[in-house]
Regions:
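Conserved phosphate-binding catalytic cores of ATP/NTP-utilizing and phosphoryl-transfer enzymes
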Residues: 1, 101, 105-126
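N-terminal beta-alpha supersecondary unit
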Residues: 2-79, 108
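A short helix-loop
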Residues: 8-9, 26, 122-123, 128-131, ...
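A contiguous, well-structured pocket-lining segment that forms one wall/lid of small-molecule binding clefts
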Residues: 66, 179-249, 258-272, 296-302, ...
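Glycine-rich beta-strand-to-loop/alpha-helix junction loops that act as flexible
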Residues: 75-78, 95, 131, 249-258
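Conserved phosphate-binding/catalytic loops in two-lobed NTP-binding clefts
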Residues: 105-106, 266-289
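Glycine-rich phosphate-binding/hydrolytic loop that grips phosphoryl groups
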Residues: 279-318, 322
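Low-acidity, Ser/Thr- and Arg-rich intrinsically disordered low-complexity segments
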Residues: 330-353, 364-365, 376-388
Length: 388
């Protein structure tokens, strides 16, 4: 059984193809980069409409399959930007109707959880979901993925992008912050807004811009922003783990690619006697493979959708989805996509003061590609029939 997934919640149009065992045969994407300013939903949607057919073709070519080999198609139903979601949904509907195959709309946030579980071998984690539009701490409880904490204003990724524009870094500023922070030498106190398991970031933008106007180097601002924001995320994640009794923590979302965030969460997990998991970078960011995998899980657990059921939902919370597949499928843990993170670089934020040395950030190289026989896996996937 081969499933194609189409991701289109925000700036990325991604298409992935997976089989019933979460072997990823292709994971292609094209990212919209605004010429200036921030992300405009309609401009991003126009970009997605222009590249969708090409990305779908590229994904099938890389997987070595054609349209007739796809048994199921899934797409990101939400949450996300309405115009972008509609492009992905339209492409999926057209493919499903043309090929007369089933279609499944999935929750984008849950897709991050499930691809992480499948590829790292963790079984029942608390998820720190740190992305552009969302920042949440999520865990499975009573048949659904419950949100135990979240941002009260903007997502961590949006905060970094907005601050990056204000500081002249351009759009998609997260990687720039990570690079600059490694060169920083002083930590400056910024608003630390944590209430229970919720966080807020907007005050940090105002304070960081004020530091910039005072002549504080960008490197020190980046260091201070990362340390403060990531300490907040680590604190609420630890509080949620204690509250719900989880011994595993999974990172997901685009900001989970940041080496310093990984280091801080890993250090916290070790201190609690827990374990941290994180998939390869390509599965942290928005991607089609995670959409395909969740669609396959849902279909194999009995979920069915008509075309009339595939209306997109800009606001679509994880706890609105009944997670039937966790009752119907046992997981066979695969090797983690990343090595364990060393905690020797970690340092408690509370011990830092202006003028102290910064903690070191960690840059992770991508793992070596899998060595499984590609053709054999494709043949096996093709031989697996759809569930009735």
């Amino acid at each position: 059984m081969l499933t194609m997934g189409i991701e289109g919640t925000a700036h990325t149009l991604g298409v992935g193809i997976v089989d019933q065992d979460c072997n990823v045969f292709s994971n292609e994407l094209d990212m919209f980069r605004p010429p200036q300013g921030g992300l405009h939903p309609r401009e991003a949607a126009n970009h997605h409409a222009e590249v969708a057919a090409d990305i779908m073709t590229r994904a099938m070519d890389k997987a070595g399959v054609g349209p007739k080999d796809i048994d199921l198609i899934s797409f990101s139903m939400g949450p996300g930007l309405g115009p972008c979601l509609r492009v992905a949904a339209t492409a999926a509907r057209a493919f499903a109707c043309t090929r007369n195959i089933p279609i499944i709309g999935v929750n984008h946030c849950i897709a991050h959880i499930e691809i992480g579980r499948a590829l790292t071998g963790c079984r029942d984690p608390a998820l720190l979901y740190a992305s552009g539009g969302n920042t949440q701490v999520i865990a499975f409880a009573e048949g659904r993925y419950r949100i135990f904490g979240e941002t009260q204003d903007i997502g961590i990724g949006n905060m970094l992008d907005k601050l990056g524009r204000d500081l002249g870094m351009g759009f998609y500023a997260g990687p720039v912050f990570e690079k600059l922070a490694k060169e920083g030498s002083k930590y400056y106190e910024l608003p630390y807004s944590v209430k229970g398991m919720d966080v807020a970031f907007s005050g940090m933008i105002t304070a960081a811009v004020a530091l910039h106007k005072k002549g504080v180097p960008l490197e020190d601002i980046a260091l201070s922003v990362q340390e403060t924001a990531f300490a907040m995320l680590t604190e609420v994640t630890e509080r949620a783990m204690a509250h719900i009794g989880k011994k595993e923590v999974l990172l997901g979302g685009g900001v989970a690619q940041n080496g310093r965030l990984r280091d801080m969460v890993e250090d916290m997990a070790h201190a609690r006697g827990a374990e941290m998991f994180v998939p390869d970078r390509q599965y942290c960011r928005d991607n089609g493979a995670m959409i395909a995998w969740l669609g396959a899980e849902m279909y194999n657990s009995g979920v069915r959708m008509d075309i009339s059921d595939t209306v997109v939902r800009q606001r679509f919370r994880t706890d609105e989805v009944e997670v039937g597949w966790r009752r119907s499928r046992s997981y066979l843990p695969s090797a983690s996509c990343l090595p364990r993170i060393s905690s020797r670089f970690s340092r408690n934020l509370s011990t830092m003061s202006e003028g102290t040395d910064p903690p070191a950030a960690i840059l992770w190289p991508p793992p070596a590609p899998p060595t499984d026989a590609h053709a054999s896996r494709i043949a096996t996937a093709r031989s697996m029939p759809l569930s009735s």
